[in-house]
């Protein structure tokens, strides 16, 4: 927490350990980097609607964020690529997100933002509750000149976002000042629906480039391994839920 040397009035606990329907407090702004790549303990998923239950932490937090936002409340949420392309419950959550909120911007971050803790590629989702999504703007955040990857001693800096800030515009007028360029492109909700809510949409202005740099190749390898591990956990979650449902059916 920037500038807070001695935090007070902070409660330690699991925010998800409470039925979703019991949240009465509503908030105007949420800025969060929820845990991702992990799963919750058995029973936590029961706090969520039966058709939206999962043990994957990031998916549960995204549902909670949508629930507790006020009408016209705004959120900025860091989520992994797996949320963008994931299916099953993830598809249902993304459908709900675009129907209940205006998911107006997704900033696609480069590899290594959270090095050395994780190499999973991440994104920042910006949305406002109370209006359906019509179009989603994507912005691909590039590495600064001369940088091939981030690390603990050379992390991402706020100054790198100056180009996004200049391009951002005003939500009040529907971001009419935004223009597509080599880093930014717009996708309609109709295209998103046709893709079954797969939001892993690549930059159409950037041709695929063959990479030979060893550091970049190694970073990509680690990212892919972590994404595989996340998908493996998701598959275990799906199979566990299916087996539990089957057991309950046999018991009846």
Feature annotation, model-predicted:
Residues 1-6:
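Short, conserved SAM-binding/catalytic segment
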Residues 12, 17-252:
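A conserved structural/catalytic subdomain of Rossmann-like adenosyl-cofactor enzymes
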């Amino acid at each position: 927490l920037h500038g807070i040397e001695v935090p007070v009035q902070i409660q330690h606990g699991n925010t998800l350990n409470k039925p979703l329907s019991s949240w009465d407090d509503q908030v105007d702004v949420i800025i969060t980097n929820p845990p991702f790549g992990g799963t919750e303990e058995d029973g936590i998923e029961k706090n969520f609607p039966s058709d939206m239950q999962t043990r994957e932490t990031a998916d549960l937090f995204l549902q909670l964020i949508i629930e507790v936002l006020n009408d016209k409340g705004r959120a900025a949420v860091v989520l992994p690529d797996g949320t963008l392309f994931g299916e099953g419950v993830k598809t249902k959550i993304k459908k709900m997100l675009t129907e209940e909120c205006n998911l107006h911007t997704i900033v696609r971050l480069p590899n290594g933002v959270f090095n050395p803790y994780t190499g999973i590629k991440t994104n920042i989702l910006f949305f406002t509750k109370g209006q359906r999504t019509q179009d989603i703007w994507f912005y691909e955040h590039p590495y600064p000149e001369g940088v091939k990857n981030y690390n603990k001693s050379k992390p991402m800096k706020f100054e790198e976002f100056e180009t996004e800030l200049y391009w951002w515009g005003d939500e009040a007028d529907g971001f009419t000042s935004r223009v597509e360029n080599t880093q930014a492109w717009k996708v309609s909700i109709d295209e998103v629906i046709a893709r079954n809510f797969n939001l892993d949409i690549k930059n159409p202005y950037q041709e695929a480039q063959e990479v030979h740099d060893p550091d970049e190749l190694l970073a990509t390898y680690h990212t892919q391994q972590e994404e595989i591990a996340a998908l493996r956990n998701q598959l275990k979650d799906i199979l566990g839920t299916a087996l539990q449902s089957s057991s309950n059916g046999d018991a009846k």
